Regions:
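Periplasmic-binding protein-like
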Residues: 43-50, 131-168, 187-204
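Bilobed "Venus flytrap"/periplasmic-binding protein-like clamshell domains
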Residues: 26-27, 44-103, 118, 123-127
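Extended ligand-binding regions for polar small-molecule ligands
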Residues: 62, 67-68, 73-75, 151-189
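Ligand-binding clefts/hinges and TM-proximal coupling segments of bilobed small-molecule sensing domains
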Residues: 76-92, 169-204
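Short helix-initiation/N-cap motifs at beta->coil->alpha
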Residues: 2-12, 56, 97-109, 145-147
Length: 204
């Protein structure tokens, strides 16, 4: 059974036993590994997506300093915004004015309406929106803090981890994985093989 629940509720659902897995754009982060395990399926980083006419204003990370930036609560963009703000402060620049929204569509809407100047999220989500919206927002600058994306599963659930790992290996071996990523302009985010993450030490 597939059930749609808010992003911020998915890890709690796994931890409480209400869900068997959560498949979305979860960046594998140390704080998340304390609650769940992951099977990686892509490599990504946080990127800024802006209106096409603003693309040249955001060519490097510190260009985000002092700007109104929209993020989804609990997302990699949310975490990245805090890290970039710390770098801004260290460089004696104004910190990011972070706007937190419950869903990506709300962050996107904030930029399109002019309430925010950029949307900070993982490169897959931002790249997908750029392609499917025909460039209403465009990805600009570099990818920040590259990390694996993973399917989240309950902590210690080795059987589900093995099942997901085997599925991904099969999709990679038969070419389906590459075909899907290329179709959405995400080929650069491909992995050679999935990895089961159970401990923070694996991220070092």
């Amino acid at each position: 059974e597939v059930v749609t629940i808010p992003f911020a509720s998915q890890i709690p659902a796994l931890a409480s036993g209400r869900a068997t897995m959560a498949w979305t754009t979860f960046t594998v982060l140390p704080e998340r590994l304390k609650q769940v395990d992951f099977v990686s399926f892509m490599q990504t980083g946080s990127v800024a997506a802006v209106k096409p006419e603003d693309k040249d204003k955001f060519t490097k990370k510190l260009d985000l300093c002092g700007r109104a930036i929209a993020v989804q609560t609990g997302s990699s963009g949310d975490v990245a915004a805090d890290s970039i703000s710390a770098e801004c402060k260290a460089a004696n620049l104004a910190e990011i004015k972070k706007q937190i929204y419950p869903e990506p569509k709300d962050s996107i809407g904030a930029v399109l309406s002019g309430r925010a100047e950029a949307w900070l999220d993982d490169s897959t989500a931002a790249g997908y929106f750029e392609k499917t919206s025909k460039g209403q927002l465009v990805v600009t600058g570099d990818s920040y803090y590259p990390s694996p994306l993973g399917v989240a599963i309950p902590k210690g659930d080795k059987a589900t981890a093995a099942m997901v790992e085997a599925l991904l290996k099969e999709l990679m071996a038969n070419g389906t994985y590459k075909k899907l990523l290329d179709n959405y302009n995400m080929g650069k985010s491909a992995l050679e093989a999935p990895v089961v993450y159970t401990d923070v030490s694996q991220l070092n």
